[in-house]
Amino acid sequence: MYRFLIFDLDETLYPRQAGLMQEIGVRINRYLIENLRLPPEQANELRKRYYNQHGTALRGLVVERPDVDPEDYLHFVHDIPLANYLGPNPLLAQMLRSISLPKVIFTNATIEHAQNVLNVLGVADQFADIIDVRRVAYVSKPNAGAYEQLLNILQVRGDECILVEDSVRNLLPGKALGMTTILVDSEDCAEVDYCVHDILSVKPVVAALLRQPPDRLTS
Ligand SMILES: [Mg+2]
């Protein structure tokens, strides 16, 4: 039995073309340039290395740079006027409302950023909870520890969750814990359970899953 429908936030609830994450990326580079006093090229290289080695720039800073305050970083990179990038999405609100399963947000960002995005999209009232990067002790996706803490917070097993994400990399650790995985904005289902063209197409997949729970091994 499924108990939670878990959504990533950025570029899952709104399309990549919105350009918001690109702007956050620009601000991540700016933070590294200004606070670590790196030339732009080195900042870019460091960001890439953190992404490959630690999953996110934040995780890289937390692990390798105890002199950097993660809260200062998180505030800086998300300090963006969201209304320039996003607007209300009544169809998304309607879609979420039509799914009876409790919905939660699982994001590498902060709860403030998540609440701001949900408010601009007009879907804040559709989510039972927001698990942000603070609540998993700054262990970002795709590190396995983030997903283990998520399950612990929700008091569920992986196979009781459906995880919706725009990133294959962030779905795989969930799948390894037994979650049913839905990749948004992709036609490449090779490594995940389902892939859909856009967020509204999640609805029929979830509806079918709720009608037909997956086979379980019985002891
Ligand atoms: Mg995302």
Name what the model sees in each region.
Residues 1-91, 112:
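N-terminal helical cap/lid subdomain that shapes the substrate entry/recognition surface
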Residues 91-100:
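Catalytic-core regions built around general acid/base machinery
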Residues 84, 88, 106, 139:
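Residue-level marker of regulatory loop/turn positions in helix-turn-helix DNA-binding domains and
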Residues 82, 101-104:
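Generic structural signal for secondary-structure transition and capping sites
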